[in-house]
Structures are given as C-alpha cells and as structure tokens.
Amino acid sequence: MTQVAKKILVTCALPYANGSIHLGHMLEHIQADVWVRYQRMRGHEVNFICADDAHGTPIMLKAQQLGITPEQMIGEMSQEHQTDFAGFNISYDNYHSTHSEENRQLSELIYTRLKENGFIKNRTISQLYDPEKGMFLPDRFVKGTCPKCKAPDQYGDNCEVCGATYSPTELIEPKSVVSGATPVMRDSEHFFFDLPSFSEMLQAWTRSGALQEQVANKMQEWFESGLQQWDISRDAPYFGFEIPNAPGKYFYVWLDAPIGYMGSFKNLCDKRGDSVSFDEYWKKDSTAELYHFIGKDIVYFHSLFWPAMLEGSNFRKPTNLFVHGYVTVNGAKMSKSRGTFIKASTWLNHFDADSLRYYYTAKLSSRIDDIDLNLEDFVQRVNADIVNKVVNLASRNAGFINKRFDGVLASELADPQLYKTFTDAAEVIGEAWESREFGKAIREIMALADLANRYVDEQAPWVVAKQEGRDADLQAICSMGINLFRVLMTYLKPVLPKLTERAEAFLNTELTWDGIQQPLLGHKVNPFKALYNRIDMKQVEALVEASKEEVKAAAAPVTGPLADDPIQETITFDDFAKVDLRVALIENAEFVEGSDKLLRLTLDLGGEKRNVFSGIRSAYPDPQALIGRHTIMVANLAPRKMRFGISEGMVMAAGPGGKDIFLLSPDAGAKPGHQVK
C-alpha cells in the first residue's frame, strides 16, 4: 500500500549535562530510534533531533566542585553523550545544546511574546536563602525533617518515605545541601507564567484523542485540582540565560529546556542552509508532525507548560507525546551497590548495541509500563531469537548456496504461498511499528522465523545434498530459506542496524520495505560470514563487576589542587570590588637577612614605590632573576609591620608552596599601575 510522504520532527527528552548516559536513558533513545528508522523505511521525511539540557543550579555547583567553568563541563559532557548515542547507533540528524545562541534567541522571543500577550506576571515571593553561599536554594538543595512523618534527611519538595509533598519552608530544621548552613528567608521578585489562562485550551487538547489514555487521565487529575501560575525565573548566581531587561534574573531551566527542541532544529536548518524548514515545522498552522518521546517523570512539563507556552507565543503545539516508563534491572531499581546502575559506555565494553536494542524493543508497547531488564532472560532471548531463529536461518542455507551453486539463488521460489504469508505480514508488522506496539511486532516476526525454520527442518537440505540428481531441489530449498531470512531482516531493520549492515553485505542488496514484494531470484549472494555471536552469563557477570568498580572509583577521594586547597566561601561582587589589584614592576629583589623564607621586593607602581616582603624564597633561589619582571600586587592591603620592616602590599602567586610556587605575571603590554579588572 502506497503511503503519502509525511514531514515528521521527532525529539527525545534532553539529557541533563551533569552526568553520564545510563541504561535508563537508553530505553527512550532506542524506542525513538526504532520508530524513526521505520518511518524512514516507509519514505517519510524525518528530522530526528536532541540536545543536552545544559542549564541550572546543579550544573553551576558541579562545575565549581570540579574547578572548571560550566561551559567547559557541559562541552565535555556533550562529547561523552554523543559518543554513547553513536555507540548505540541512535540516528540523530542533529545533537545540540540548550546553551546555544539559537536557544537564547528563541527563549527570549517566546518570553517576549508571552509578556506582550499578558501571560507573564510579577510578584514578590519569600524563599530560603543560603547566607554562606549567597544564593537562593532550589527545593532539591534543601534537606530537613519531613513535616508529615518526621523522617529525617528529606528534600525540600517531597518526602521519599511517606510520599508527602510540601514547601521547603515547611521542613523541620532545614539545612542547605550546598554549605550545610541553616537557610534564612529572603524576599525576591519573580516572574510567573500564567498557566491557568490556558486551562480550556489544554483540556480540549487532552480530549482530542491523540494522547495516551494514561496521560490524558493524569492531566484530568491536574485540571480538577486547579492549574497554578508557574515560576519561570531564578535569581543570580545561576547558570543560564538572563531574562531581558531584568538584571540578575535568569530563565528557570525548565523554560528554556523544551525550547531546546526548537533550538536544535534551528541549528540543523542553519547547517543545511535551509531558511524555510524551521517555520514550516514550527509555525502555528504547520502541517508537519511533531512528536516528543519522554519519560513519565516529565509529563507535567510537556503536557501543560510546553503546549501552553507554544500557544501563547504563536507557535504550533506537539502532535503527540509518546511516554514510556522506567527501567528496572533484575526486578529492582537500578543499584550502584549491586552493579546494576549501568552506564551506556560500560555496556558497550561488554555487549554490542543491537543486543540491548532488541531486548528493549521486544518488551516495549504503547503503554506507560516499566521495563525490566532481566539479565539472565536477556542472554536467553538474544541467543534464542537473534542467533538461533534468525541468523541460523541464513547460515544453515548459505553454505550450500555458496559451495554448490557459486552463490547464485534459484530462479523460482520453492514455496510461493509460504513467501506470500511472509510478505502479507508486512501490514500487521508495519502497523505495530507505527503504533509503537514493538513487542507485538517482535512476536509476529519471531512467529514467522519459527515458520521459516520449520520449513527448512521439513525440507532437510542436508539430506537432499547427499542425494543424486537433486541439485535443483537443494538450490530451491536453500534459496527459499535465504529469501525468508531476507524478509525477516527487513522487518527487523529498524531494530538491528549493525546486524542489518552485515546481512545486506551477505545478501548483496539493500533491504527495503517495498523490496520484499519481489523475491531474490537468480541473484548472486556473497560468501557467508558469521553474522552474530552468541552471548553468555560470563559477559553479564563482567558487566556487573565493571559497574561496581566504576562506583568505587567515583567514590574515591578526589586528588589534585582543588582537593588539597578547596575553593573558599563565596563572596559578593562588592566584596571583590574592594580589592585593588595593580600591575607592578619588580625594580629590585634581594634576600632578607635572618629569614630563609622571605624575599624583599621593591615594586614600581607607575609613580609610586612599594616595599613588599614575600615568602617565595624557596621558589626563587636567585632573586636577581626577578628584576625587570612584571607581577600583580594587592595595592590597597593595609601595611603590615614585620620584624624586618614594613610590608606595603602583597604580590600574587599560585601553587602549593615551598619550591612549587609561581609568581603571577600579566600579559605583554600591561604597564606598572594598570588596574586588574
């Protein structure tokens, strides 16, 4: 059946840029990729995009902990994420970042339109504030005793013991997760998105029939409890985009994160030199289809805030949300101590990507059900289905074709009716792929694989091969087996991209959905090479052990300059502005009699001389070598009376001390007296 080609934009939820990709993430990206690959096989124009979610307090604080800039951290994490997704053959057309110029412009545009349309409100709120770190504390950065069940060490938004939700101000004996200090209440003006204004539109969207039943039911609960205005701003310090005309105020990460879908697509259009497609996909009356694959934990943002933001800023809404459940391993939540919290990169060190792609696909449906990765069942299913049923079908027939018939298949089908049974299944299997009933598709394909192997067992080519005058029968039987293998691999192509490549090389033809209507007759195949290897529990044991070792390594004490000399408490800009740093010329440097640590430096500040004692003698045993160098000094430090005289400032140096200390110097061109700004 010929289909009309559609324009489709598909996204996965944006991974947060402060941690590695794990097998929980991979469920969604594999699910989306299988669906996208099927759509492409059917001739549709699909743009498949993603990006890193790169803003927020957790990223700012982790970068500080690592002693690097947030930009450096998210850049390194993006490379790691993209490597992992490529390793699992996720066929993204573009992978970008929310910390991009495209995303900044689109975030400001959407905010400005919402504000102009009256959907942004201002009001002053009271929040918990860390007096030591000088920052307002997000809910998850406050811990204390649950006000309901009195369980200790609970986060500021909900209790993991009794499940209660509450405000962080309701916590008993709250503490800052950042510094351990007791937070204080402080007022701040915040910006709110008027979500209740979109209640009628959102309810109509919910009743349209497009959303999964479980999602629609959950949304109805939210409507009944009443929609609230959404706080879309955060106070400095914060890593993100500053709100236009609001110094010190930043967009909350969940405002610019979904806009990252648009930003990544805009980046793709710009790379292609295509100025038309962005509007074609995102304008209000777009006929293109837009699908978001997401986990059930972020339905609230994608089903309420996101479509309302788009509606209020005159952009199109999603065609649908495809929501999935969580991943458990061996029937339990992923556990670092048990070695079942498995990173994507660790998996690829022990198994190929196709194995996990197949197992997840076999368990997925269109419902929001959790998926259990039972590692013993995983080994059994991969071996039983991929190796024994599919690959074995090719191997048990290819040898005869290669050896006895120079790789040439028979000119007629041995069993046209059986072949028709296989090709007629395209409609049912295609519908299963289309509707995300992946488990059903796999069951249909494996039922066909059983039929194919039963045919070979009944025809017994290994017996026919020994009988005189039956060469034509042998060629026909084995050619039939290879043609059935070709159909099976065509149906499995969205799931097993690497195995498909090897199968296409053997079959000497590309596997296409419509191509199976015409069997390979009189066609020459290539010499058969092993297509897939069996897996065993020893690989699983090695995988689990490797995951445990990674946890131990991550928990090991951090070494290096930051560990030896941690960053001091946060100061305000006003505190820093009090320090007057100046470029100084070292006119003279000499030993200080009676001291084995100090050098006496005579510094020229460009019109004023200073006498400074500095404890750098061990690092500079020849003080004459310092004469003529430029350095940086604290010029407004109060004079300090010492046994050897008065020190009138301090020079800047870095290092742990002793011989390992290094005097700081300005770049070429700086002159004595220049202020460091």
Curated annotation (Swiss-Prot):
- Out of the domains of life, which is the source? Bacteria
Q: Which PROSITE patterns match?
A: AA_TRNA_LIGASE_I (PS00178), TRBD (PS50886)
- The yes or no answer to whether the keyword RNA-binding is present is yes
Question: Recorded E.C. number(s)?
Answer: 6.1.1.10
Name one molecular function that GO assigns to this entry.
methionine-tRNA ligase activity
| Source organism of the structure | Escherichia coli O127:H6 (strain E2348/69 / EPEC)
Q: Binding positions for Zn(2+)?
A: 146, 149, 159, 162
Chief site of localization: cytoplasm
Q: Which SUPFAM superfamilies match?
A: Anticodon-binding domain of a subclass of class I aminoacyl-tRNA synthetases, Methionyl-tRNA synthetase (MetRS), Zn-domain, Nucleic acid-binding proteins, Nucleotidylyl transferase
Q: Where is this motif: 'KMSKS' region?
A: 333-337
Role, per record = Is required not only for elongation of protein synthesis but also for the initiation of all mRNA translation through initiator tRNA(fMet) aminoacylation.
What NCBIfam families has UniProt attached to this entry? metG (TIGR00398), metG_C_term (TIGR00399), PRK00133.1 (NF001100)
Q: Domain tRNA-binding, which positions?
A: 575-677
- What protein name does the entry list? Methionine--tRNA ligase
Q: How does it assemble?
A: Homodimer.
Family note? Belongs to the class-I aminoacyl-tRNA synthetase family. MetG type 1 subfamily.
Q: Which residues bind ATP?
A: 336
Q: Which Pfam families match?
A: Anticodon_3 (PF19303), tRNA-synt_1g (PF09334), tRNA_bind (PF01588)
Query: Where would you find this protein in the cell?
Result: Cytoplasm
Xref: PANTHER family: METHIONINE--TRNA LIGASE, METHIONINE--TRNA LIGASE, CYTOPLASMIC
GO CC annotations, alphabetized? cytosol
